[in-house]
C-alpha cells in the first residue's frame, strides 16, 4: 500500500480522535476545541503520522538494548511532538497574530507555546501510543489494504476538510486584521469563551460547531473583550 494513502488514513484518524481528546480535556467547558468548524484537529493528524513513522523505526534496532531503544524512541516522540506544537504555535503567532494556546503561566515555557510539562505529556502519550494504539493501527492498515474502497471516504474527508479550512480562514483573517490594527495578539480560546458567555447571557442559541457565530459582529466582541482586559490590568496597578 502506498505511503501517501497510509499517511492520509492516519491523518484522518489522528485529527478526529485528537479533537475528541481535546474536548474531554476541557472538563466543564463545552466548546469546540478546534480551529476548524468540523470535529478534527490537524495538529493531532500530523502528530499521529509522526508517531507511526517513529514507531516503525524501532525495527531498525538503532540501540542494541531493547529497553534503552524504547526509551530513546519515547524521547524522540516527545521531541517531535513538541517541535510540531512549536512550529504550529509560532506560525500562528508570528504570521496570523493569533495565539491558539497559552502556556505562559507554566514553568519553563518558551514564548508560551511549549513547556516541559506538556513535553512530558507528549512523551507519555507517545508511550501510550506505542503500547496501546500502535498494534491497532497496524491492524487497521492491514484492513485498509484489503478494503481499498474505504479510501473513497478518506478522499471525501479531505474534500470536506479543505472546504472547512477555507471557511475557517475567513475568521482568522478578521482576527489578524483586528490584531494588526490594535497591535495586540488575539487569544483564540479567550475570544471563543467570550462569545460563548455573551450568547448565554443574551439567552441566544449557542452554536457548538460555529463558536464565532453571534448576533453581534466579531469585531465588537474583540473590542469588548480587550476593553475588559485593559480595565483588569488598570485595576491591578
Cite the ranges covered by each PLM segment:
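Aromatic-rich, lipid-facing transmembrane alpha helices and their immediate juxtamembrane interface loops
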Residues: 1-237
